[in-house]
Regions:
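Short N-terminal strand-loop motif that marks the start
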Residues: 1-66, 400-424
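Glycine-rich beta-strand-centered segment in the early N-terminal region that forms part
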Residues: 22-37, 51-100, 113, 125, ...
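NAD(P)H dinucleotide-binding glycine-rich loop of Rossmann-like/cofactor-binding domains
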Residues: 95-177
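C-terminal hydrophobic helical "lid"/dimerization subdomain
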Residues: 162, 243-248, 269-276, 320-424
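Adenosine-nucleotide cofactor-binding segment
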Residues: 175-176, 181, 192-270, 393
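Hydrophobic/small residue at the entry helix of a nucleotide-binding pocket
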Residues: 186-187, 214
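Rossmann-fold NAD(P)-binding glycine/threonine-rich loop
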Residues: 269-272, 276, 288-308
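Helix-to-beta-strand junctions that scaffold the AdoMet/dcAdoMet cofactor pocket
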Residues: 278-280
Length: 424
C-alpha cells in the first residue's frame, strides 16, 4: 500500500514523504488515517530530533511519522486478529503506550503515526489496547479524544490527603477551588470545559491568562452563566499588569488559596505563582511539558512540610481516560470542537509543526487525504469570495457560530474523494 506521510528527518526537519508500506504481519493492522490534530508535543519532537527522549537515532534513513491524535478506518486485518477487528471498522488511537523506552506513535516509528494517509499499527500497540473502537461518525471528535484524554488524566492524577491517614484521595477536591493557569489556549479550553461539564463539581474555577483575545474567546465558548447554572462560580482573570497577581487571585478565595492548581505553560513565573496559590493540602499539577531538561523553579518547602502542599506532573492519559473522553464527547457533554481554530491538509503539516508556537489560535486539525493550506476558520468567509470550497465551508460553520462541525468535515472530505465508508 502506498502512503503519504509527514516525517521527522532531524532537528527542525519535517518533510512530506511518499513510499510503499511493507505488507502487514499476521499480528498487525493496516489503517487509513482520516484526521489528526496537531499537538505541541510534536513540535517539541521536531525541534529536538533524536535528542528528544522518544525519538530514535538514524532519522535520515528511518524518518519517523509525526502525529498521534488520530482516528480512522481499518483497511486490512492480520489473520491472527480477525476475531477482534474487522475491515471498515472505525478506530481512535490511544498513543500512551507506557513502554520503558518511551516509544510511541508520532515520535518513534517509521510506519506508525497520525500524519499519514495509511499507517501500520504494530503488534505491541495492539497488545497494549491502544486501538479503541469508535462508533461515531465525526472524525474530528475522535482525534480530539486524545487531548481530552490528557486533560481528564490530569484531573484524575491530582490527589489529596488526610493527616496520618496514609492513603491518597485521588482526583480534585470535591467542592474545592480550582485555578487553571495560562489556560485560555487550545488545551485550556478543554480543561475549562471538563471542569464545568465533566461532573467533577468544584465550587469555583478561576481561569488565568495574559492574552485578552484568548480569554474573550474562552468566555464566549464557556460563559460564566453556563457554569453558574451548574452551581459553579467561573471567573476569568487577565493578570497582565497586576503588581501582585498571586495575592489578587488568593483574594478570590477569601485568602484560603486553591485546592487544585493546573499549570498549562512551562514558564517559571507561572509555576512560581502556582506554588503561591496553593491552599493547605493543595495539589499543583504541572501539565505543560518543558523542552529544557534542566527546567527548575524555586518551590516553597515550608508549605510542603507544614501545609502538605504537593506536586504531580502528568503526560498523556490512560485508556480509561480515553474512553471517558469519547463517551462524554459522543453525548455532547463535552465539546472538543471548541478547541479547533484551523483546518489543513497533510501538505500543511511540516510548516504547521515547525511554526506551531507562533500560529495564533487553538488546535490545528489535519485531514490527511486533503490538500489544503492551514487555514483559520475565521478566514473561510474571506477566502470564500474567490474559492467555492471555502465559501461552502464558511456557510457550514456559520450554522454552529463559527465552530468546526461534522457537516463541514463531511463536505471537505467529499471534495477530495476521501473514503469514510468501508476503505479499500
Amino acid at each position: 500500500m502506498k502512503t503519504k506521510v509527514a516525517a521527522i528527518y532531524g532537528k527542525r526537519d519535517v518533510r512530506i514523504r511518499e513510499f510503499e508500506l511493507p505488507d502487514i504481519t499476521e499480528n498487525e493492522l493496516l489503517v487509513s488515517v482520516i484526521s489528526d490534530s496537531v499537538c505541541l508535543s510534536t513540535w517539541k519532537a521536531a525541534l529536538l530530533g533524536s535528542e528528544h527522549k522518544r525519538v530514535p537515532d538514524d532519522l535520515e534513513n528511518h524518518p519517523v511519522i509525526t502525529g498521534h491524535e488520530c482516528a480512522g478506518i481499518i483497511v486490512e486485518v492480520g489473520k491472527n486478529l480477525t476475531d477482534k477487528y474487522k475491515k471498515g471498522q472505525r478506530f481512535v488511537l490511544q498513543p500512551a503506550m507506557g513502554l520503558p523506552s518511551g516509544y510511541s506513535a508520532g515520535y518513534s516509528y517509521e510506519y506508525f503515526g497520525g500524519n499519514a494517509t495509511y499507517m501500520i499499527i504494530p503488534e505491541v500497540a495492539i497488545n497494549l489496547g491502544c486501538v479503541l473502537p469508535y462508533h461515531g461518525s465525526y472524525f474530528a471528535a475522535a482525534s480530539l479524544a486524545e487531548p481530552m484524554c490528557c486533560i481528564i488524566g490530569a484531573y484524575n492524577a491530582n490527589y489529596h490527603t488526610t493527616p496520618y491517614v496514609y492513603e491518597h484521595r485521588m482526583g480534585v477536591k470535591p467542592g474545592g477551588n480550582i485555578a487553571l493557569l495560562a489556560c485560555a489556549g487550545p488545551m485550556g479550553i478543554g480543561a475549562i470545559d471538563y471542569a464545568i461539564n465533566g461532573g467533577i463539581q468544584p465550587s469555583r474555577v478561576v481561569v488565568v491568562d495574559i492574552d485578552e483575545a484568548r480569554l474573550t474567546q474562552a468566555k464566549k465558548l464557556l460563559p460564566v452563566k453556563q457554569a453558574a447554572e451548574k452551581g459553579i462560580e467561573l471567573i476569568y482573570v487577565n493578570t497582565a499588569g497586576m503588581a501582585d497577581p498571586a495575592a489578587q487571585l488568593r483574594a478570590l478565595t477569601d485568602g484560603a488559596g486553591f485546592d487544585d492548581v493546573f499549570v498549562y505553560a512551562a514558564v517559571p513565573s507561572v509555576v512560581e505563582m502556582a506554588d503561591d496559590l496553593l491552599a493547605e493540602d493543595g495539589c499543583l499539577n504541572f501539565f505543560a511539558g518543558p523542552t529544557d531538561s534542566q527546567f527548575k523553579v524555586p518551590f516553597n518547602f515550608y508549605n510542603v512540610h507544614y501545609n502538605s502542599t504537593h506536586v504531580v506532573g502528568t503526560s498523556g492519559g490512560s485508556t480509561g481516560d480515553m474512553k471517558e473522553a469519547i463517551a462524554l464527547s459522543a453525548t455532547g457533554q463535552l465539546q472538543p470542537s471548541f478547541m479547533v481554530t484551523h483546518i489543513g491538509g497533510l501538505d500543511a503539516v511540516p510548516d504547521t509543526v515547525l511554526n506551531l508556537p507562533d500560529i495564533a489560535g487553538g488546535k490545528k486539525l489535519i485531514y490527511n487525504g486533503v490538500t489544503m493550506p492551514l487555514t483559520a476558520i475565521t478566514d473561510f468567509a474571506e477566502k470564500g469570495k474567490t474559492d467555492p470550497l471555502f465559501r461552502e465551508l464558511a456557510r457550514l460553520v456559520e450554522e454552529t457560530h463559527g465552530i468546526w462541525n461534522e457537516k463541514a468535515e463531511r463536505y471537505l472530505l467529499a471534495q477530495f474523494g476521501v473514503d469514510i465508508g468501508e476503505a479499500a
